[in-house]
């Protein structure tokens, strides 16, 4: 069973990384999106972001250098990604259960990072009672149960809301319930493992050390191995579901919500526009399904006042 857990971990992490990269690459290859024209745009310079303005309000803006700030953009993105700021401001009841779930998962990733650091320090020969290693182990021992507890409370709360709130229940598929159930089971096993067999994460550190050195040593706790299997399966499963939004949110914020680069001396934008304007229209609306117009470029340049539609019915 131990060998299986090690091999499954290697495979699961590889599947997660490859599937996540595949999803990101697929997104970046999508056709150019329509601009939302939503303000404020976080990276807007000149003090305009504070009141929802934009560079288009400047006279002859196309002749002026643009002022943008990645730091201002991150100052909006980071609180949203970590603390779900928009949900807090606009849907407080949902935030009450969604925040602990997401933040608990973030802390769980932090726990894994601490376990990796601790395993490396132990492999380097530091004794467990040394200052640095002891600090890392102590931090992991505190962070672990907090992370598991927060995520479990949030997952249970989200499941309850999907079952009882009509505004969510009407739009919930079986996948949503299965995903939450998978997290609940995995987190329950993690808490049980921590409480009964691995309160200081010594077994977990040994397992991580084995992974790093390819020393697939035996693990004596079946409960810990069950925890590993559930965690790895969940990790590998995430990129194939809507839960991938946790790592796709950066792209959705940057490329969809805030992308406002003007088409001025921008050959890459011209190339993208040329591609999408060459697509064949498939809409059936009369102002789109124009006889003889074979591309979106034809539709976009068609002037119904100068070129009456041939199929237009006359009174």
Which stretches of residues belong to each language-model region?
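Membrane-interface amphipathic/juxtamembrane segments adjacent to transmembrane helices
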Residues: 24-79, 260, 264
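Membrane-proximal intrinsically disordered regions of secretory-pathway and membrane-system proteins
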Residues: 4-21, 50, 55-57, 265, ...
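Alpha-helical structural motif
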Residues: 20, 70-74, 222, 243
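Generic, well-ordered alpha-helical scaffold segments in large soluble proteins
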Residues: 20-23, 27, 81, 159, ...
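Long, highly hydrophobic alpha-helical transmembrane signal-anchor segments
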Residues: 1-39, 207-230
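Long, contiguous internal "core" modules enriched in hydrophobic/ aromatic residues
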Residues: 84-226, 231-262, 269-315
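Alpha-helical transmembrane segments and their immediate interhelical/interface regions
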Residues: 6-8, 22-23, 58-73, 137-164
């Amino acid at each position: 069973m131990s060998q299986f857990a090690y091999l499954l971990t290697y495979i699961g992490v590889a599947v997660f990384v490859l599937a996540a990269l595949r999803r990101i690459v697929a997104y970046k290859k999508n056709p150019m999106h329509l601009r939302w024209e939503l303000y404020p745009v976080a990276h807007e310079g000149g003090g305009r972001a504070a009141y929802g303005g934009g560079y288009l309000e400047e006279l002859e803006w196309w002749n002026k250098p643009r002022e943008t700030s990645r730091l201002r953009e991150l100052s909006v993105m980071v609180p949203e990604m970590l603390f779900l700021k928009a949900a807090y401001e606009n849907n407080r009841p949902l935030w009450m259960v969604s925040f602990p779930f997401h933040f608990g998962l973030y802390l769980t990733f932090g726990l894994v990072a601490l376990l990796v650091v601790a395993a490396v320090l132990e492999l380097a020969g530091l004794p467990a009672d040394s200052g640095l290693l002891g600090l890392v182990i102590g931090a992991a021992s505190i962070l672990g149960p907090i992370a598991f507890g927060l995520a479990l409370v949030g997952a249970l709360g989200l499941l309850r809301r999907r079952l009882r709130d009509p505004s969510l229940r009407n739009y919930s598929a079986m996948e949503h319930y299965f995903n939450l159930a998978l997290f609940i089971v995995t987190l329950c096993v993690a808490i049980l493992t921590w409480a009964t067999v691995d309160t200081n994460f010594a077994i977990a550190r040994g397992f991580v050390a084995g992974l790093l050195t390819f020393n697939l040593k035996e693990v004596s706790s079946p409960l810990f191995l069950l925890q590993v299997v559930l965690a790895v399966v969940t990790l590998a499963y995430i990129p194939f579901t809507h839960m991938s939004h946790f790592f796709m949110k950066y792209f959705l914020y940057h490329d969809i919500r805030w992308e406002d680069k003007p088409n001025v001396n921008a050959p890459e934008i011209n190339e993208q526009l040329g591609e999408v304007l060459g697509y064949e229209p498939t809409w059936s609306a009369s102002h789109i399904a124009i006889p003889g117009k074979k591309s979106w470029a034809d539709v976009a340049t068609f002037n119904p006042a100068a070129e009456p539609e041939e199929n237009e019915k006359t009174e």
